[in-house]
Each structure stands twice: as C-alpha cells, then as structure tokens.
Amino acid sequence: MANGNEGDKTLLSICYNRGSLQLLDQRKLPLETIYLDIQDTKDGWDAIKEMVVRGAPAIAIAAALSLAVEVSNLSSFDGTSDDASDFLSNKLDYLVSSRPTAVNLSDAAVKLKEVIKKAATTAKDANSVFQAYIEAAEVMLEDDVTSNKAIGSYGASFLKEHLTDSQKITILTHCNTGSLATAGYGTALGVIRALYTDGVLERAFCTETRPFNQGSRLTAFELVHENIPATLIADSAAAALMNAGRVKAVIVGADRVAANGDTANKIGTYNLAVSAMHHGIPFYVAAPLTSIDLSLSSGQEIVIEERSPKELLHTRGGLGEQVAASGISVWNPAFDVTPANLISGIITEKGVITKKGAETFDIAEFVRKTSGNL
C-alpha cells in the first residue's frame, strides 16, 4: 500500500510502500530534497528525535510505519503469537520515548497495541500478528490524509461564516502544519489551503518560528510551491502585524490538547495567542482528535520537551555556525501551553469545538456527541 497524498513528491514527508519507508529529511529543506531510508524502529526513533520528521501527526505515522517495515522484512521470528505481541508492544514503547509532548504518537501506540492484543488471541502464529499490525499501521496513514482534508473543510466553512466583515480573509499561522507535518494536506495549513481553493484567502502570513525555523524553511516552502499568496514575518513582528490591522484570524496546530482545551504547540504559540486577544483577533487551533488527550484535565499536566542548547547557539536550528557567545546558558523549550481562555475554537475532523460562553472547552462532551461518527 502506498500513501495517498496528492501532488508533487517534494511535499511528501512520508513515502511508504509495504516493506519500504523513506522520510524526507526536513532539516535540509528548502535547499535540498533528500529522502532517508528507514529500515527499522531504531532508524525511526532517530529520525523523530533528530527532527528528520516532525509535526505531531507525521511523527506518529512515521513511528508506526518504521515498525511495520521492520516486521515486514524480518527474515524469521522464533516465537508464538504472544511473543510477537510482546515484541511489537516493546518496540512501540521504545518509539513513544522519542518525543514525549506530541500525544499523537502515544495515542497511535495505544490503538496499535489493542490491535496486536486482539490478533494475538485469535492468531495461530506470529506472522498473523505481524500482518494485523502492518495493516493497522497502513490504515493510520490513509486516515490521516482523510481527517486533514475534513479539518480544512470544516475550518474554511467556519471562518467564512464568522469572519463576515470582509470578502477576503488574511490568516497568520505559526510553525509548520501542512503536508510536511502530516501524511498529507495538513491541519492549520490545510484550513489555509481550503480557504485558498474556495477563493476567499487574501494572504497567509507565516512566522519564521525560531529556533528551528519551521516557518521560514517549511511553511514558506509549501506556500510558494502551491502558489498561495503568502508573506514571511519575523516571530517578533507578529504583534505589529496585528496592530496594523492586517490579520483577520490566527490558526495554529497542536501537539497535545488537554480536556479543557489548553493546548501545547510550538514555542511562540502562547505569544501569538496573547497578542491576538489584545487586538481582538480570533485565535484557532486546528488538530485531529488524535491530538486531544482527555486523560489530562489541563495544560499544567503536559510534559514539555526541552531541546539542545545548540539550536539557539548556532544558526539553522543548531546545524550552522555559532552565533552566540560560548558559555551563555540556554533555555530551549520546544513547546509552550496556550490556555483555553485565549482560544476561540478548536477545529477538528468532526467539526469545530467552541466554548459556548465558558472560559474553557468541554472536549469530552464533544467527543461523546461525535463518537458515533469516529
């Protein structure tokens, strides 16, 4: 099975056929397009940890498929169906340890473990358990593209309905939430794509997204590739842009959303939400339901990953020359948490979650009401 993303291969972060997986090395973009072969879970873990692949949905799928490739190419396995189940479960636990903040990865692992456990109870041999796992991982790949397109559709319709003061809409976004962060199409950038397709997008503004520059390197690359009218700004210019009246709405993605709507996303998201609130601009999160963690009551429980000081001390997110003084201490959280009271709505593949006058969201109720369609 091949991934079903439409368009040019340059915008495929994940290239998969059964037994074969290549990941686009996003550290090299936009200057080089290089795909790395992923042969097993060790390769998958390294690719996720070292930011070859990033974006919560893409991380989950890349991890799942790295294990699918490993078991597809096993020359032999000396064990029972229960042994195969244990083997797969341990590999999934290992993959989850690569990046702790994005809930999609742990959510995918939980769902895949359920598939494995069920298969082990009915399978006659280990190979049948492996086959069940491979098929489940491939379904996740297909489902991600489908859910992203639904997010784009719901988001575009909602914005057109609520932003009625102008015929054209200008959107500010942060980090990268497009085809490069998912299996295809994107979440927040998917909404921008849908608005552009509908003919109502005036312009998209994207932040550079320091220190790893996902905005300048990746989002700008996607927008230019698709001829979407876009402007790159410095992270520190966002408030001035809002004050100038050039932003109608802010849309970002999410790595983990708590039950009350508190949202962990790329560092700098909180800044944008505060500025948007001050300027009376609606601030939306676009994310699949797999990014929602109902086990967490609020964002205070979200574990925030801290990354290498080198990403701040050197250019290109740590890959280039040193620009800061040796000996300076560094604080480099990869994410921050935006409180729910700053968020206007959460756009999902099942519709837009709103607060209905409250300070926080009742996401559990939304999930319950839409569970029949999941």
Curated annotation (Swiss-Prot):
Enzymatic reactions: 5-(methylsulfanyl)-alpha-D-ribose 1-phosphate = 5-(methylsulfanyl)-D-ribulose 1-phosphate
Q: What is its EC number?
A: 5.3.1.23
Q: What is this protein called?
A: Methylthioribose-1-phosphate isomerase
Encoding gene (name)? CIG2
InterPro entries named in the record: IF-2B-related, IF-M1Pi, IF_2B-like_C, Initiation_fac_2B_a/b/d, M1Pi_N, NagB/RpiA_transferase-like
* Pfam families membership: IF-2B
In the induction comment, the record states: By cytokinin (kinetin) in suspension cell culture.
Presence of keyword Isomerase: yes
What the entry lists under HAMAP family is as follows: Salvage_MtnA (MF_01678)
**Which family does this protein fall into?**
Belongs to the eIF-2B alpha/beta/delta subunits family. MtnA subfamily.
GO annotation terms (biological process): L-methionine salvage from methylthioadenosine
Q: Where is the site Transition state stabilizer?
A: C175
**Gene3D superfamilies registered for this protein in UniProt:** translation initiation factor eif-2b, domain 1, Translation initiation factor eif-2b, domain 2
**Keyword entries, A-Z:** Amino-acid biosynthesis, Cytoplasm, Isomerase, Methionine biosynthesis, Nucleus
Catalytic center at which residues? D255 (proton donor)
GO MF annotation list = S-methyl-5-thioribose-1-phosphate isomerase activity
**Record's GO cellular component terms:** cytoplasm; nucleus
The record's annotation in PANTHER family points to: METHYLTHIORIBOSE-1-PHOSPHATE ISOMERASE
| Pathway(s) it belongs to | Amino-acid biosynthesis; L-methionine biosynthesis via salvage pathway; L-methionine from S-methyl-5-thio-alpha-D-ribose 1-phosphate: step 1/6
* Job of this protein: Catalyzes the interconversion of methylthioribose-1-phosphate (MTR-1-P) into methylthioribulose-1-phosphate (MTRu-1-P).
Where does it reside?
A: Cytoplasm; Nucleus
